[in-house]
Amino acid sequence: MFDRIIHWSLRNRLLVLVGTVVFLCAGGYVLEGMPVDVFPEFAPPQVVIQTEAPGLAPEDAEALITFPIESAVNGTPGVAKVRSASSVGLSTVVVVFNWGTDVYTARQLVNERIQSVRDRFPPGTNAPVMLPITSAVGWLVKYSLQSDTRSLMELRTISDWEIRPRLLALGGVASVVAIGGEVKQYQVLLSPERLRAYRLTGEDVRAALARSNVNSPGAFLTERGQEYVVTGLGRITSLDDVRNTVVKFIARTPIYVRNVADVRFGAEIKRGDGAVGVTPAVVGTISKAYGADTLTTTYKVEVALAQIQTTLPSDVTLDVQLFRQADFIESSIHNLKRALVEGALIVTIVLFLFLMNVRTAFISLVSIPTSLLGGILTLHAFGIGINAMTLGGLAVAIGEVVDDAIIDVENVFRRLRLNRQSPHPAPTIDVVFEASSEIRNSVVYATFI
């Protein structure tokens, strides 16, 4: 078979040259659009469901929330296994699907199953939430917010309400999760003595706040040919709105929240903390969406963070160098480029030292980009992107390619030289054919082994 391929190539040299040029152009075009990541996707498609039930014990969360969800999703088509974990006030269920399952279809199927068990959850349970689709190695960038003059609550507010929305608007970003700092919240500190004096309970205050914290739609008011929308504005926007909420009327006298409680801004109870070294800070983790290109998304995130930095107060420091996944990819690409350059130099030096012929060196050098782009086309055909493992494999393979090219070119060069010294020289094509066929099987088999 190898002899027939060599013979056909020698008889159709122009076609082979044109095909090689087209092959190189196609490989370069495909290379530009291939996704780049640190590692290939090594985890099967999965859907993560989290359900919050404030105050619920782990045993109750497992029995009343986790188990019903597990039972509902177990029969979903394509499910390989279901894992779960229950903690204080939180249920987490991980539904793992078979390889090849479309993750978006899987999410739709799981969502339909969840709806059938929502009514069975205990009162006060939040609606189940499916976490965003992220890659198995989805951490793109980690940033931190620090300040010598501002409180951790202010830093967390900046992260949650200024940085996070702008980053989520970028294509390829799946989630932005901040840890550390203090989450700002309205706190109503009830006084048992004042509650008893007005014969009220904590539930009365809670219900009053829930009723008042809404904007009520009204009708239309028509006047002078114009329609005006009537809306009851009750949404809480300040501490005074909370203080002035009416809890109850006693003898036609309103009892306000301020009469039975102290109202202030405070920090949510912490579940963990964040720091850079030993300095408290707000640390944000940006994760990329499933299938997104790591380098492209990272560059967009860095541009956005640079723009955000200009809008932050001067006493707030935004550090975007805590972690950068793209560094690993860029390092792998740099190593591959270095391997290409070193391989080309070694081939050139070896061939010039032993053969002293420019044409042989050029032919061997051409084999490097041709083989490399051939590998890129093969990866693309199998749906595999560029990552540290494929780049490492290509870098190692370059050595084999160069070795094979040197052996072939050296043997052809030697046979041509002997043919020129012969009293009855044979046709050049026949000499090249015999020289290449002579070592072809050995080279191919040795390369495969």
Name the predicted role of every residue range.
Residues A344, T348, V443-F448:
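Hydrophobic alpha-helical segments of membrane proteins
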Residues L10-L14, I333, K337, V341, ...:
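Internal alpha-helical transmembrane segments of multi-pass membrane proteins, especially GPCRs
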Residues V16, V176, L195, F328, ...:
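Alpha-helical transmembrane segments and their helix-entry boundary regions
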Residues V205, H334, V358-A361, N387, ...:
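Helix-terminus/capping and membrane-interface signal
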Residues G27-L31, T317-L318, L345-R414:
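Hydrophobic transmembrane alpha-helices and their membrane-interface caps
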Residues V16, A85, T222, S364, ...:
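The H+8 position on the N-terminal DHp helix of two-component sensor histidine kinases
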Residues I329, I333-H334, V409, R415-Y445:
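Helix-loop junctions and hydrophobic alpha-helical segments within the transmembrane domains
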Residues M1-L345, L353, I386:
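Membrane-proximal extracytoplasmic
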